[in-house]
Regions:
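Adenosine-phosphate binding glycine-rich loop
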Residues: 37, 132-240
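Glycine-rich phosphate/diphosphate-binding loop of Rossmann-like nucleotide-binding domains
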Residues: 37, 44-108
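Rossmann-like adenosine-cofactor binding region
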Residues: 82-151, 157-159
């Protein structure tokens, strides 16, 4: 784990803000008229994703590692965790994952198999959303999470609904970069890619087991490429 963090130190991006409004349709589907700003999220060691989510409106975030909640002043934090402690967990909540997850609306994990238990899910807010994306064995399997009360569950696996796979993003993102001859791949372009992917699931199609298109949906590449190229132009990094 420490080796992974050392590798990430060179990849820390500046936290930026956006004027565009996020469309978290799956959240609204589960909680009528709710907004992402109202939600409390527990995120396991995915610094870059946390910054992007926070820039899109998610405010109440607690980042955890194998020692529990990360908070400002915790001893033994490496530079990247010290940085994250300054912009997350403003109440300086302390404790293990099992302790800080109580009452949380969302869990996002890209960590290790079996780190989220059914007992933990039962202590979360009503109808929690679980992204258990460790591969090949997730933090918790979908059937276990749903039996414990989860409303929406995503994993990185193709044999379960709501697969989160980076193949949804990369082909179209790089096509958009090339089409715009972009000098950078900035956060605005990443956000645009996310919106484009989410937008391919219509309100009529949206269910708890279909919140994003399939990994090899032929519509995805072109939709993402168009959105990314446009975002590159609007953010000033396009060269054509």
């Amino acid at each position: 784990m420490e080796k992974e963090w050392k590798k990430l130190i060179d990849e820390v991006e500046n936290n930026r803000s956006y004027s565009s409004e996020p469309n978290f349709k799956f959240v609204d589907f589960i909680r009528e008229k709710s907004t992402i700003e109202d939600k409390r999220a527990i995120v396991q060691e995915v610094e870059r994703r946390i910054k992007l989510l926070m820039s899109m409106g998610l405010k109440n975030v607690i980042m955890t590692d194998r020692k529990g909640a990360i908070y400002e002043g915790r001893e033994g934090l490496n530079p990247i965790k010290e940085e994250m402690a300054k912009i997350t967990n403003f109440n300086k909540e302390k404790g293990t994952l099992a302790e800080v997850i109580k009452g949380a609306d969302i869990f996002i994990g890209v960590s290790a198999p079996g780190t989220l238990t059914q007992d933990m899910v039962r202590t979360m807010a009503k109808d929690p959303i679980i992204f258990a994306c460790a591969n090949p064995v997730p933090e918790i399997f979908p059937d276990e999470a749903k039996a414990a009360g989860a409303a929406v569950v995503s994993t990185g696996r193709s044999d379960y609904p709501n697969q989160v796979n980076n193949v949804l993003c990369f082909p179209g993102l790089f096509r958009g970069v090339l089409d715009a001859r972009a000098s950078d791949v900035n956060d605005e372009m990443k956000v645009a890619a996310a919106y484009a992917i989410a937008g391919l699931v219509s309100d009529e199609e949206l269910t708890a087991e279909y919140i994003l298109p399939a990994a090899f949906d032929p519509r995805v590449k072109d939709a993402v490429a168009k959105a990314v190229a446009e975002a590159a132009r609007k953010s000033g990094v396009a060269r054509i």
